[in-house]
A protein has these predicted regions:
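Short, T/G/N/S-enriched strand-turn elements that build extracellular solenoid repeat scaffolds
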Residues: 1-24, 30-41, 53-65, 77-93, ...
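Terminal non-domain segments
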Residues: 41-61, 66-78, 82-84, 184-200
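Intrinsically disordered, low-complexity regulatory/activation regions of eukaryotic proteins
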Residues: 73, 90, 180-182
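Extracellular beta-strand repeat scaffolds in secreted/surface proteins
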Residues: 73, 147-149
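Long terminal segments
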Residues: 32, 164-200
Length: 200
C-alpha cells in the first residue's frame, strides 16, 4: 500500500518522549528551575541561559536535558549547562552580562540603559547618526541580521571590541528638499487671484 502526503508548511522532527516547549526562544532561569523535571526539553529554535543567577547545579541535579538547534549560554553557566545539550546543538557562548534582544534594535541611549553595553541581537540593528557617541560605550555586539548606519560612523562601529554581525548597510542619503512655492519670494508685478496669476 502506498500513500501520498502533501505538506503545506514546515516539518519539525523532535526526539521521542521529549517535552515540546513552544516559542521562538526558551529562557532557562530560576523560574524555569521551579518546574523542571527529569525530562528532555525540546524547542524548535533555541534555549537562552544568560542570567548568572541561575542555579545550574540544581538544574543539573534534577536530571534535565535539552535539545534545540542552538543554545546561547553566558560564560559562567556554560561549564555546567553545555553537557546537558546534545552534540547537534550549536552552543553560542557570550560574556556574562550580555542581554539577548529577541527583535530588531535601534541603538539609542534608552536602549543602552535598558539592555546594557553587551548585546546579542536576534534581528537587525539600526544606528542613527545621532547615536555616534554611544558606539564608544558598546563593549560587545553580536547581530544575527543586518546593521544599518551612516557611512561616517563605520570606523567607530568597527572599533567595538567584541563585534560580530551580518551585512553592513549604509543609510541612503535623504533627497534634497525642493523649495516650496510658498517659500518663493513673490514677484512684485504679479498678483495671484484664486490660483490665477496676473502680470501687471
Amino acid at each position: 500500500v502506498s500513500a501520498r502526503c502533501i505538506l503545506n508548511g514546515k516539518l519539525a522532527v523532535y526526539p521521542d518522549d521529549a517535552v515540546l516547549l513552544p516559542g521562538s526562544s526558551i529562557k532557562l532561569d530560576n523560574t524555569f528551575l521551579l518546574r523542571a523535571q527529569s525530562r528532555l526539553y525540546w524547542n524548535e529554535h533555541r534555549f537562552l541561559a544568560v542570567d548568572p543567577r541561575l542555579d545550574t547545579a540544581a538544574l543539573a541535579a534534577k536530571g534535565c536535558s535539552f535539545s534545540a538547534p542552538k543554545a546561547i549560554l553566558c560564560a559562567s553557566l556554560a561549564p555546567v549547562l553545555a553537557p546537558l545539550f546534545p552534540d547537534s546543538t550549536e552552543l553560542i557562548i557570550v560574556p556574562d552580562g550580555t542581554a539577548v534582544v529577541e527583535d530588531d534594535l535601534e541603538l539609542t541611549a534608552s536602549a543602552l540603559r535598558r539592555y546594557g553595553s553587551r548585546l546579542y541581537v536576534l534581528g537587525d540593528v539600526t544606528i542613527p547618526a545621532e547615536s555616534a557617541d554611544l558606539l564608544a560605550r558598546v563593549e560587545s555586539l553580536h547581530v544575527t541580521g543586518e546593521v544599518q548606519l551612516p557611512e561616517e560612523l563605520e570606523d567607530a562601529f568597527y572599533a567595538i571590541p567584541d563585534l560580530e554581525c551580518g551585512k553592513v548597510v549604509h543609510e541612503a542619503p535623504l533627497p534634497p528638499e525642493m523649495p516650496s512655492l510658498d517659500d518663493e519670494e513673490p514677484d512684485p508685478d504679479t498678483v495671484t487671484l484664486s490660483g490665477f496669476q496676473l502680470t501687471l
